[in-house]
Amino acid sequence: MSTITVNGTEVWLQGQGDEVILMLHGWPDTRALWDGTVAALQDRATCARLTLPGFESGPSVTSLDDMCQLLRQIVDRISPDHPVTLMLHDWGCMFGYEFAMRHPDRVARVVAVDVGDHNSGALLRSWGFKEKLSVFGYQVWLALAWKLGGSLGTRMTRAMARWLRCPSDAGRITHKMNYPYAMQWFGTAGGLKHAAPVDLPMPLLFVYGERKPFMFHSVRWLEKVAAQPGSAVQGLPCGHWVMISRPEAFHARVRSWLWGEM
């Protein structure tokens, strides 16, 4: 393994092969989310991963524009001559989608896990009152925990992580990881209202957990992705953390889509 630092963010590089896969996690995770995935793919690709700025160290919040700029700097360092493959989960999907749409020349294809058209009217309409209340409840709770900060904010965050059955190491979870929710609900650091609707110009493999109280994609968007040449969708019988709950099936599907392995 080798390590580089880009604008204060440490990036780990593991594996071999000309293809570079940049992995972005979400809440309440770190680059450790991808440990098993790196082990499963590093024989065919160079896997690059980072912990999102602010989740453990760095600025308390990173705006959408600054995040896209950082990702551009990272991609230009790790693969200056060829576009990369993005592998995304949770908030990593939101940030990664935006980067891919702003810089389509730097992204060859995308593997996204469990978050699809996050800002679409179709998704909002697909949620009933109970689903909307659930989403509002946990996300605003986490946004408030970030705002409060300190030990109280961290206790609130860990309590929500337990309630949501997050597989992450609870001892590493802090309120610092919640700033995307503050961006979403409080408009912190410019907010997320200017994020573009998710419409990727490159092939997409979208893998999602089928056993959740609500989905983070609309059926309409799923059908649109499935109909695009080169793209595919795959549901697996699990919750939000697909790569943890169903690692063998997830990694087999990814390898099949990326490299045609059966």
Where are these regions (language model features)?
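Flexible "cap/lid" subdomain of the alpha/beta-hydrolase fold that forms the substrate-access gate
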Residues: 33, 48, 53-85, 94-234, ...
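Post-His helix in hydrolase/transferase enzymes
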Residues: 244-258
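Glycine-rich phosphate-binding loop signature in dinucleotide/nucleotide-binding domains
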Residues: 15-16, 75-82, 257, 261
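A short loop-to-beta-strand scaffold at the N-terminal edge of the catalytic core in hydrolase folds
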Residues: 5-14
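Hydrophobic residues on the short alpha-helix immediately C-terminal to a glycine-rich phosphate/catalytic loop
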Residues: 37, 99, 253-257
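Conserved HGGG/HGGXW glycine-rich cap/lid loop of the alpha/beta-hydrolase fold
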Residues: 13-57
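The conserved beta1-alpha1 loop
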Residues: 22-26, 89, 208-209
